[in-house]
Amino acid sequence: MEADLLCKYEVALRESEPVKYVGHVTAVRGLLIESRGPHAVVGELCRIVLRRQGRPLIAEVVGLAGSTVKLMSYTDTHGVEVGCAVVAEGAALSVPVGDALLGRVLNAFGKAIDGKGEIYAPLRSEVLRASSNPMERLPITRQMVTGVRVLDSLLAVGCGQRLGIFSGSGVGKSTLMGMIARNTDADVSVIALIGERGREVMDFVAHDLGPEGLKRSVIVSATSDESPLARVRGAYTATAIAEYFRDQGKQVLLLFDSLTRFAKAQREIGLASGELPATRGYTPGVFETLPKLLERAGSFSMGSVTAFYTVLVDGDDLDEPISDAVRGIVDGHIVLSRALAQRNHYPAIDVLQSVSRLAHRVLGADMKEAVRIVRRALAVYAEVEDLVRVGAYQQGSDAELDRAIAMRAELERFLTQGAQERVRFQDTVTSLSMLTGLSIAQPPSGV
């Protein structure tokens, strides 16, 4: 017993650091702070002592060059001067996790910003974690119900699937995210608002999400006026919180807005650290970081994280670098059309340009056939829509086109849905059955 006790203290003494290694700031270059020492590793937190303000500034090691440590602050660098002491904290960024987070709005570092008091959670989780072993992932066979008619039928989503929502500005992606968060059958929703305007955060919480959606949600906000490192770490914080609830056996929905602003923040960090710009000014580190973040969602034995990532498409160009890179990583993409939005067609989902790569695994045979009929009708009508509108098409010339025209009005009603309208899954199946004339005997597997 005494030997075990002595062994415990011996280990504690061996791992303790009675002497703190202290470095000193040597230069401040824009976002980047350079110091000589201390001994630290990339990703480690450091405390910069501001001599004139009497408070510490928390920064993170983003690069090393010989004895020079390159740091980036989580806040602005006001008050930093040459000679300020830099102390390594010996740990990376971690955030509190637990049920106490539900219904709360947090900043990028897991601290409450909603005025409801401090969050007391006994557990903490590091935000920078490696993605799981691919052999630990489970096949995706169960459908997640979103409460959005077009997604639950024509673009079915599986539990653990990752989808990109591609959209220009002002086309309704925040409204669509709010609809999904309110109506989903997921146990917990984690919502990351990265790089948003401050006004939009409150608008989303009050109007798009609402009190009902907030009860089972955790919101992580890192607004556009915060440092690029705070915006990037906010993305990882939201993902780490989602992983915690997944490990508790929950089916988790992760809504991320927006991946483009995350990429731009990562670009700022890369440029400040000395990376050379590549495609459209994005540094190579951006394209290295995207899969590391996105691969953390998925289906596992404990639970699943189903993720929707919005991509703000510059100039409505779906082939711009970030859109192209994300489309190659996710398991499907939902394209929001400005033309549909201008016609007051909401949600403005362009079904023909959108695809769910795992829909065939979660839909039953009857649903697959109904979806095939609807998509075919949409495609046939789209080919000759201009001719039909100007009256140049003569009815009876093409039987398939005649059927598509006859279905058009009902299709429009099926594809549109009010922002506050909640559609039960069985009602979606019934509507699809009436639209196609098929008897859908069984719902998608797992529902």
Swiss-Prot record:
UniProt keywords, alphabetically: ATP synthesis, ATP-binding, Bacterial flagellum biogenesis, Bacterial flagellum protein export, Cytoplasm, Hydrogen ion transport, Ion transport, Nucleotide-binding, Protein transport, Translocase, Transport
Statement: the UniProt record of this protein carries the keyword Secreted: no
Top-level EC class as recorded in UniProt: translocase
GO molecular function: ATP binding; ATP hydrolysis activity; proton-transporting ATP synthase activity, rotational mechanism
Signal sequence segment: none
UniProt name for this protein: Flagellum-specific ATP synthase
SUPFAM superfamilies in the record: P-loop containing nucleoside triphosphate hydrolases (SSF52540)
Organism phylogeny: Bacteria, Pseudomonadati, Spirochaetota, Spirochaetia, Spirochaetales
Entry's family note: Belongs to the ATPase alpha/beta chains family.
Catalytically driven reaction(s): ATP + H2O + 4 H(+)(in) = ADP + phosphate + 5 H(+)(out)
Binding site for ATP: S167, G168, S169, G170, V171, G172, K173, S174
GO BP annotations listed: bacterial-type flagellum organization; protein secretion by the type III secretion system
